[in-house]
Structures are given as structure tokens and as C-alpha cells.
Amino acid sequence: MDLLSIQDPSFLKKMSIEQLEELSEEIRNFLITSLSASGGHIGPNLGVVELTIALHKEFDSPKDKFLWDVGHQSYVHKLLTGRGKEFETLRQYKGLCGFPKRSESEHDVWETGHSSTSLSGAMGMAAARDIKGSKEYIIPIIGDGALTGGMALEALNHIGDEKKDMIVILNDNEMSIAPNVGAIHSMLGRLRTAGKYQWVKDELEYLFKRIPAVGGKLAATAERIKDSLKYMLVSGMFFEELGFTYLGPVDGHSYHELFENLQYAKKTKGPVLLHVITKKGKGYKPAETDTIGTWHGTGPYKINTGDFVKPKAAAPSWSGLVSGTVQELAREDDRIVAITPAMPVGSKLEGFAKEFPERMFDVGIAEQHAATMAAGMALQGMKPFLAIYSTFLQRAYDQVVHDICRQNANVFIGIDRAGLVGADGETHQGVFDIAFLRHIPNLVLMMPKDENEGRHMVNTALNYEEGPIAMRFPRGNGLGVKMDKELKTIPIGTWEVLRPGKDAVILTFGTTIEMALEAAEELQKEGLSVRVVNARFIKPIDKQMMKAILNEGLPILTIEEAVLEGGFGSTILEYAHDLGMYHTPIDRMGIPDRFIEHGSVTALLEEIGLTKAEVMNRIKLLMPPKTHKGIGS
């Protein structure tokens, strides 16, 4: 079949199971080949081929609503809804998004980049449906990794209480990104081994219906027998107690089982949970045999060998450098512990976990719990390193404020993927953390200019005992700078001048330092002497240096790879205002007030104007007339 010619899923209605099985194989081959060039979330999508096809055959999208959670398992859905020709642009600038995108297709009714949101969204859609009196099916498809998120459990509780008609598909592949952890995952394991429960339950109900109505005592006894047998067969029927009709577990790669259970679910009133067992990476051996999450999402790879295609890095990854330094310091201080919300591989904590298993805590997709747990450990004298992506730190905001900062707990928050992250797009860009952290009392916030300074900042953070401290660091690799042999402690709230200058000042930090230095070098050739300051402490700022700069009256340009609204530049404007320096020319460069979509970081920086050329232009515009040739008259 020509997969690129698919316009919508209606063609599936006429296909036999044998034809669907052939289609499954074709789709897997297409995904393996296509993603070998572009990269993407291959593991999750190879696992949901049959499930996605079965859903589109059995239901009528977009009238019936599919909510994919997490959204990276929606590639087959995209293919079946007419986007095959766009797969060569997957996750590229102006190309096909790697997550559901409402502006892409009417079949994408809910956008998910962060996990555990589908059930709440589905509850909202079901409530709206019932108010309007329409009849569509609402079908959230949630991976059991996403089910460990507290938000999903809150929604399960509410859905069961409201008894809304809904079919929840639990896509249980035993993994989220890394292997799942926690009691819920263990419970699902017990359910997998108790597949006879549904059959026994149905037989019991049939027999009980045939018992003559001889009084309440016998009926009550029968109910107790049924309940006792239920708990004997399946320890803790969690979903049924919440008010769901539980179906499964069923083989997620068997069309016979999928159709039988989907048809039963459609006829059942109230919320239904269909527990589907799938194999992550099915059909591609390197992905099938992955046990730690390497093949969850990848870059390009060689199909025949499974080797990843990537240039040899000239420097270590930022995640590896930070976690490696934490691990190094943990050898000397047994109070240091590491906490991650389901990202041990991405945060490069495998080495720490292997060396210090008793001090490593992967709490699952539970950012709020991770933050508050870190506070609890800190208040008992430990030194917790909370490794968390910038985009996921958003989910723990109240815990950072209420539990960490308000209690002045000595927690080191390692904010990974700070700044633009590229291909994962607007749900994952790490651009909001400065704005939502810099105003919180007690918190220190910093970002290094390179990996050498990064190691010193990790050392500073784990030796800081005055309260919480956070370090931002970007996705990708360092610059390959020379590393100091000895770790140092950087005085809190101090900046450094990287390049002297007497005509203007650039204040920046982190990934934009290199661009600022290059711009200053070019401006020097045009007769402008521009000072470049490494404003490595975003909070507290170096007030002594800042006051001196303001007293000089020099034009100031702030640059940050973060949102301008409430960001570092706003801090400088506020400080200048507080000192009464109303006439100092100050300009700001950063992320504009909109969500930044997917694409290479280079392309995105060009689009939003965070470039060397624009830095030079902004400096020239700040200068008074006649300071620079060609400006003024």
C-alpha cells in the first residue's frame, strides 16, 4: 500500500484482519526507515501500530476524540490521518510536529508534550459533550508511565465519581522513557499475570443472575463471595474501586483481542479502562531489546546495525558533566543524594545510580513529589541534587515556592535543557524558568558560561548551606574548553568582566556569552569598544558591579535565551529604576512573548533575532549620535 497517499482513516473500515496485519508491517517498515534519517520517538510508536489502526477502524475520528498521552506515540495516528508525505520534515523547522498539533489536523484534538494530561482533558470533553447533548466517544490513550503522574490519578478519581461515558486505553509497555517505577507499575504487573479475572468475573455474574430471589441475605453473601474472589485473583482491583469497568489485560498486537474488547467497551455505560499490553520498539530488534530507554527517542541511526549517526563530540554533554561532577563530590560527601522524575538516562545519572544505588531516587513522572521529597531530605541534613528539565520544573512550581524556598531548604536544583531545545518544540523549550524563579525569596539562580565554570558552580551549589540554589544548563555539549584540575567555589552574586570596553556594556550569561564576545570583536573593528560581562548569577545580581556600570552612564544591552517578560533584562531595568537611573539607555534581547515551535536551535535563534548581527545592530542603535560612523548626523 502507498502509505504516502493516505488521506484519512476511512479506508480501514473495509479491510480484513489479514490486510490490517500486512498494513502493520508496512507501517513499521516505514517508521524504521523514515526515522533512521530524521530521528524521533521510534520506540513508543513501533509499539502502538496495531492499537492505533484498531482505534481508527473501530471509531470515527475526528468526531470521536483521541487524546494521545504522551503525544510522542502519535506518529501512526499522523500517518493514518494523511500526513505521510510530511514525515521527511518530522521535528524539523516548519515541518511536521513530533506531538499532536491542533493546527496540523482536525484529527489532533488535544496537544500533549508533557505527560499525564489526557484524562483531565478527556473529562472536560466528556462533560462538554453531555452538556451539549452530542454522542461522540472520548478515548484517551495513556501510557502507564504517564499514569504514574499525580494529575492522571486525580482525573481517574473524578471520572470514576462522575461516571462519565469514556473509554480509557491504558497502553502498558512496562516503560515510560526509562523503566517505570512505583507501586502503580507493580500493580499493573500483577494485573498482567491475572488475565483470567475478567473471564471468572463474567462467569460469576452469569451464575449469580440465575440465583432465585430468596432474600437479601443470600444476595449479600453472593456479593461478598464475588468481591472476595476478585481480590484473591487480582490483588487490589484499583480501577474497579475507582468506578471503572476494567477490561484486560489484552494483547495490544492482536487485532482479534483488540476489536473484541473495543466493541465491548463501546456498549458499556460509564467509564471503561481497557488495559492493553504492547511491546515498545516492536519489529525492530535494537529497540525491542532496549531496557533503559535509549530507543525511546533518538537521533538518526543506521537501520542494519542500530548504531546512532552523530558527529563525534568535541566536549562532554552538559547533562553528563553536571551529573558526573555531582557523582565525583558524592564520593567525598555521603550526604549527597540524587533525585530525578523519570529521567535517569536523559539526566545522565546512570553512573551515579550504579555507584550509589542507595542514594539515587527515580520517583517516576512525579515532579511535584520529587521537589517536596528533596526538601524533606534537605531538612534532615542531606544534600539533594534535584535533576529536572526546565520544562518539567514548571510542573513543580508550587513545591519549589512552598516546600523548598519558603523553608529555605538546602536543595540543589539542576535545571537541565535550559533555553531552546530544538526538535521537541514548544512543549519542551526551557525558556520560562528565569521568569518564574527569579522573584522567589531565598533562591539563588545561576548559569555558567562554559563547562569549566559549570563544574565550579556544581561545587559551589553542593557546598552552599544558606538555602536553595539552582543552576541552569543547556541541552547538548559543552564548548571543549580547558578544565581546571581543582574545583573552586564561586562567591555568590558575583559577575566577571570577560572583555573590557568603554562605549557600551553587554550583560549576558550561559549560551549567549560566545555570541556577545564575537559581536564585540566585530564592533571593535568598527570603532566601538564594547564591554562583555558574564552575569553568571541571575539572582542575586552583582549589585556592586551593576551600580558602577550605571554610574558610568554607558548604554546597556542584556541578552538571554529565555523569555523577556519578567526575565533577566527586567531585573536590570528594575534595578536601574530603583537607583533612579532613568536616563541610562537599556535594551533587552531574548525570547519574544509567544511559544517557540520546533526546529533546529540555529534556525530558531535566527527567526527570533538572537544572532550576532542583531547584537551588533542593537548596540549601534543604543549609541548616542556621532559615536559610531553612520549613526546620527
Curated annotation (Swiss-Prot):
GO MF, one example: magnesium ion binding
GO cellular component, one term: cytosol
GO biological processes: 1-deoxy-D-xylulose 5-phosphate biosynthetic process; isopentenyl diphosphate biosynthetic process, methylerythritol 4-phosphate pathway; terpenoid biosynthetic process; thiamine biosynthetic process
Keyword Cell inner membrane: no
Cofactor: record remark: Binds 1 Mg(2+) ion per subunit. Binds 1 thiamine pyrophosphate per subunit.
Known function: Catalyzes the acyloin condensation reaction between C atoms 2 and 3 of pyruvate and glyceraldehyde 3-phosphate to yield 1-deoxy-D-xylulose-5-phosphate (DXP).
Protein name: 1-deoxy-D-xylulose-5-phosphate synthase
Species for this entry: Bacillus velezensis (strain DSM 23117 / BGSC 10A6 / LMG 26770 / FZB42) (Bacillus amyloliquefaciens subsp. plantarum)
Gene coding for it: dxs
